Amino acid sequence: MVSLTTIEQSPVKCETTTEKESNDTRGTDSNENAETKETKKGFPFHDLAKLQKQYKNKSSRNESLVALIYLLGSMLSFCLLIFFTDFYLIPLFPTTTTMTDYIVFNFYLLNVFVFCMVHFIYHFVKNISLQQHLEHWQKFSYLSNINLLISSQITILYYLFYDYVFFFKIFTLLMNFIGLVAYFFILTDKLISSKRFNKTVFFISVSVVCCSLPLLTAIITFDGLENLKERIKVNAITWELVALVAASIIYVTRFPESLFRRNKKEEGWNHSEYLFHLLISGTAFYHFFILIQSYILMHSSLNQPELINFKS
């Protein structure tokens, strides 16, 4: 009897187990189908979740701080681009402010905004280690450096030679030619593959050529530095050059971690990467302050340009 009951019950158990297995397989298939449907429907959100996870795993504090610096710089330059000329520049000298002043300030602020935004995107991409896009954004960051350098020189040239149109045209064409040569070295990958020292020498040499030729011409034309000080703030430009040289030294020597033999991967506000970009972004806005001072000097002097005025 015992054996018969066991034999009779065994098919029932087999049927129940097969039913459970079939239900389990159906459940897993339905779950997989539901997951695939959800991923197909919300594909961008799925990518965003992966991006957030990748950012948490690979982000560094230094790159986050640098990206934050340029994000704040882009926001500030955008606000200045929208409001500064209309609410401060024109009311300061309403009868003598020209359309050229308006264009000069907005042209420089636009380049500062592009510079900060491109560097923000580059360091954000670098922070999450998207290697397939990193090289392209590195090129864009170098191009934005050249754009900012050339625009800063052209804008200060206007206030240096506002009554010498020939010199302004010649040096503006020269700055554009130097910028095109720099573009060639950047776009042909000759600069990206070079070392940190060679990159620094490249940018310093471009800066020296762009600054020295107009200043020497102005000193000869205006009979010394005293007359030159009536047009631009020479002391402020000197401090700007000192800041750029200090940033270059920090970039090459990796100061201060190299001096104190600290771990190069150690992160903090006093890391060389953070200090370098803080100085570079700070000099961009400091040059904007120099332009304001030069604008005040020009419109406060007797030699005011007779161009299109906003108020007659």
Curated annotation (Swiss-Prot):
Segments in the Lumenal topological domain: 86-101, 163-165, 223-231, 299-312
Q: Which organism is it from?
A: Saccharomyces cerevisiae (strain ATCC 204508 / S288c) (Baker's yeast)
Please explain the role this protein plays, according to its UniProt record. ADIPOR-like receptor involved in zinc metabolism either by altering membrane sterol content or by directly altering cellular zinc levels.
**Which regions of this chain are Cytoplasmic-facing, per the record's topological domains?**
1-64, 123-141, 187-201, 253-277
The record's induction entry says: By excess zinc.
Keyword tags = Endoplasmic reticulum, Membrane, Transmembrane, Transmembrane helix
* Sequence segments annotated as region (Disordered): 1-38
A single GO cellular-component term from the record reads: endoplasmic reticulum membrane
Query: For bias kind Basic and acidic residues, which ranges apply?
Result: 16-38
Its protein name is ADIPOR-like receptor IZH4
How does the protein associate with the membrane?
Multi-pass membrane protein
Listed Pfam families: HlyIII (PF03006)
- Signal peptide extent: none
- Give compartment(s): Endoplasmic reticulum membrane
Q: Where are the transmembrane segments?
A: 65-85, 102-122, 142-162, 166-186, 202-222, 232-252, 278-298
Give the Gene Ontology MF terms in alphabetical order.
signaling receptor activity
Q: Which family does it belong to?
A: Belongs to the ADIPOR family.
